[in-house]
């Protein structure tokens, strides 16, 4: 859990914004969303594999565009 210290004469809004930013950097909200509902291990593996394939195709298309632009 991210901890921030409220500085002297620091407005509450600024401290809250710093706390939210530190939570976002720590990945707490994404972890909560991921664990909100139970996901079967097979579904989790399938989702991870699909995202890996998507990353790979995206990378290959970017490389292909670089190659085309060189001409």
From Swiss-Prot:
It comes from the Bacteria. It comes from Buchnera aphidicola subsp. Baizongia pistaciae (strain Bp). The lineage of its organism: Bacteria, Pseudomonadati, Pseudomonadota, Gammaproteobacteria, Enterobacterales. PANTHER family: MITOCHONDRIAL 28S RIBOSOMAL PROTEIN S21, SMALL RIBOSOMAL SUBUNIT PROTEIN BS21. HAMAP family: Ribosomal_bS21. This is Small ribosomal subunit protein bS21. GO terms for biological process: translation. One of its GO terms (molecular function) is structural constituent of ribosome. Signal peptide: none annotated.
